[in-house]
Amino acid sequence: MTSGDLSSVLNILRSLYKRTRTLEEFADGVVFREGRRAALLQPSDTHSFKSFVRGVFVCSDEELQDVPSCNQTCTFPELLAFILNSLKRKRRRNVLAHGYNFLGVAQEDRDADHFRFQGDLSQSAAYIHSSDLWKKVTARLGTDVTRYLLGSCSVFVLAPPSCVFQICGVPAYDRVSMTTASSGFLLRPPSRKHKSFQVGKKTRSANLTKTGSVGDVEESRKRRRVESEVSTRKRKRESEEEESRERRRGVHHEERRQHEAVLDESTLSGKSGENDAAAVKPPPETSAAPPPLEGGPSWRSGAFPPLPSSQCFIRTLGFLYGGRGMHGFCLNRKRRTAAGPRRLQGQDLVRLVFFEGLPYLNGQERKPKKLPLRYFNMVPVFGRLLQRHRKCRYSSVLHRMCPVVELSRAAQGELSSLIPQHCAPHRVYLFVRECLTAVVPEELWGSDHNRLQFFSRVRGFLKSGKFERISVAELMWKIKVMDCDWLKLRRTAGRFPPSELAYRTRILSQFLTWLLDGFVVGLVRACFYATESVGQKNAIRFYRQEVWSKLQDLAFRRHIAKGEMEELSPAQVASLPKGTVISQLRFIPKTDGMRPITRVIGADSNTRLHHKRIRDLMSMLQARVRSAPALLGSTVWGMTDIHKVLRSLAPAQKDKPQPLYFVKVDVSGAYDSLPHDKLKEVITEALSPVQEEVFTVRHYAKIWADSHEGLKKAFARQVDFSDGSMGSTSMKGFVMSLQKSSKVHHAVLVEQAFGSNLRGKDALQFFTQMLTGSVVQHGKKTYRQCRGIPQGSVVSSLLCCLCYGHMENVLFRDIKNKGWLMRLVDDFLLITPDRNQAQSFLSILLAGVPQYGVVANPQKVVVNFQGSEGGGAFPDIRVLPPHCLFPWCGLLLDTRSLDVCKDYSSYAGLSLRYSLTLGSAHSAGQQMRRKLMSILRIKCHPLFLDLKTNSLESAYKNIHKLVLLQACRFHVCVQSLPFAQTVAKNPTYFQQMIWDMAHYANALIRRSNTGLVLGDGAQKGSVQYEAVELLFCLAFLRVLSKHRPVYKDLLPRLHKWKRRLERLLGDLRLARVRQAANPRALLDFLAMQM
């Protein structure tokens, strides 16, 4: 094996750990307490042992502190058992302990013998325990060194030819952040106090600031904390109010124990989102925690030490799916006491905001029992807030700001009339602003400046998309803490230390965070039903409670009228099996109706087991499909499968053109109309050959380096048939098999879980139980689904494809002889040179196939030929010309040449703002770059760029259109930058970002055309580097020129770049670029919103 095979993966390890060495190099640096060096390798060792030692990599951040002994104090199995029991007892994250769980042993027996295995060995522990090579390593290095290796280091083992897998240590994927790139890009220009580095190729570079190290950040935090404590002690000695000071300091430490976010002073100057260093190992994301209740402190992550304010978020998911009235509003809640529930008072609200949160209302013990003096002084103003809340007429404000349009009685019974009756986010903001003005006393704002700044954040928050979020740092930006006298311990003017300002800032951030996350979000949930909609990306619609009630009632009645569900009587509900999981029904608005979504929600053991069994069923069906692809018929899962089909057709069609007939058919209500009997038959037929087969289920993580997107990670779950060999169960054999199948190369893999106790008959039994026992609750009634499958299940698409694949194998078996059939779940597309075959296929589907529940929707049927009798045979369908761009699943196919382009008409009337989820990151520039690069990789698909499938003219047009859309996304991202960051503050960085995207697009285009000469430095080939760069220049100039004030510092650089490229390209190639950039071909983009 050459060293070059491992260079990429070793670079990954070196970027994650301070020290990365082979086991041989690690052993050479060990000096025992007895005075001699470790001798791991000896001349008499076998070649396999030497290769093993040189193929094990030891990674750590610190050196071995204690001087080890070379003695053997216990056997290797005893040492392994001691390490595993210690890890589980101390609850430490370590790959070695994955799969090792304590059996049903009493606690006394566990503590009695730590040198005995108290759980089943699996995964890494089983691999090490059964390895004679590791026993030899332990014998030569001693117990102390082996314990240090397995308990404190991260050890990786080579899996030839180019991967490694982790066997112990904290999982490596914890050190890879997906929110920020690994580069040091910042939004501000470089400072003279910092060193700079070069990025890009040759002279195309930009000097940007390096991020600080993690150690420096932690050291500065400790220093600030020590200084704060010293100054606090000084003030305590000097203060006359010694008792009140002591209380305040007690609250300070109590709040630290409650993991409240501490806001840095730099946040107030607007630098928090710009100058934070990109840590190698970021704090855990708050999204890992379950969503809190309404009004709860969702910005508290529970992490310790507390996260900085730039990493504490309030999410728009908090106000989705509410609309339950004001009785659940946080200020209308009552506190449970020994004497019974009572209304909130000022003191209760202070505790709700600054201390316990919502658990306080449920009777949780008060901490501290007496409010400190500073907080005690706040009670009157918060009491006035409650009084103003009880006097506020929310309903009249709601009717005035968000009125309901009066409809006729006939229109009130139609979904098409009620669906558009949603309130614009701006109207919702006006309602919230009016309520905030009426309820919050002026004293709490401190100044009109603070009030207007908070209103601005509320307006942006309500206009956000479904997965957007705002950080506490962004919420506190430009807020003047000194304007708020209620934060002070004493109302007298005078000097105070920086720690006092930091403390006041933290208190104010807590209040404003509660005001947004508790009051605003709670008020929106109480008065509106906020939901996403089909075809509107992540945009949120706000429906008045009474409008949504009518919509939901109409949609449910129509759903029941289809005969797919039967109501259960109370006796039938009581007789349901104990483990029955009851689903909830939710509706999502569409253009012309409502889509029902069935979801199983809950955290109990039955729900978790149900989800696990569904995932197992899906994985087994996927494994079965991999071994027998014919089960899926003509199913395509995305653009990659479509490209494979068209690549087999297009070359022959281009060489010898012939008339092609296209038929597009969409099935109406595909999921809801599948007959249970037929579905049981299909799944039984699919799983019957493997009912006695044993399946292995492996969960693993993968880390790899992308030259343009930095370090990336992904999590996967794979199910395979077990052949009983060691290669199918060991992680090393699994990684080697992945490399043989070209699924993984130059990557670090971490096994998370492994199981081999699944059988096909178990999956078939669960599927039958799931199908017959699908129970749905809506309101106070319970129903059983007697037809169709739930739309919200992860396995629904696969079940639908298997059923339709079975139908195709029965009815359309002969199509492959003359035509090509593709189906994306329930969207059929037939391409055939035989007109009779096209008419026969269309006739069968239009007539319906009741045994499979297939009923075609005539409004979505499209053909490019007339019927047999001048169009009279198919009167209700859409007929296109023989030569046209044929629409199917967001694509446009040329019916003559089979060129493919994307259908951008679906963007008409939509805002690109809602197609992107940027979030509020402390390194927004890095997040923007990573997001745009990942989108570019997805959009530059071979389906549009492959010159064997598409003509050169079509490929150029596809490139220009996707780059033009990328420029629109770039503008949307710039508009969304937090802390008023602009391109003018660092135009070099944004120019470099555009340049990097052009380089990445060039690489993706060449990757899509492997084997073809597209262009080089001698201006040869069909698609030159300079041509793609010029397309980027033209697209970005076209979009950014419409916003000259924003990009006044960037546009001259793009014009200079454009002129240079035009000089490099010849007349012929320049004409090709201008042909693709013709404004007449960009009509689809005119209706797009940004």
From Swiss-Prot:
SMART domains per record: Telomerase_RBD (SM00975)
Reverse transcriptase domain sequence ranges: 569-893
Any one GO molecular function term: metal ion binding
Effect seen on changing W477F: No effect on RNA template binding
Basic and acidic residues bias locations: 218-232, 252-262
Compositionally biased tracts (Basic residues): 190-204
Compositional bias (Pro residues): 281-294
Effect of W477L: Impaired RNA template binding
Compartments it resides in: Nucleus; Chromosome, Telomere
Binding residues for Mg(2+): D666, D826, D827
Sorted UniProt keywords: Chromosome, Magnesium, Metal-binding, Nucleotidyltransferase, Nucleus, Ribonucleoprotein, RNA-binding, RNA-directed DNA polymerase, Telomere, Transferase
Role played: Telomerase is a ribonucleoprotein enzyme essential for the replication of chromosome termini in most eukaryotes. It elongates telomeres. It is a reverse transcriptase that adds simple sequence repeats to chromosome ends by copying a template sequence within the RNA component of the enzyme.
Name this polypeptide is given: Telomerase reverse transcriptase
Source species of the chain: Oryzias latipes
Gene that encodes the chain: tert
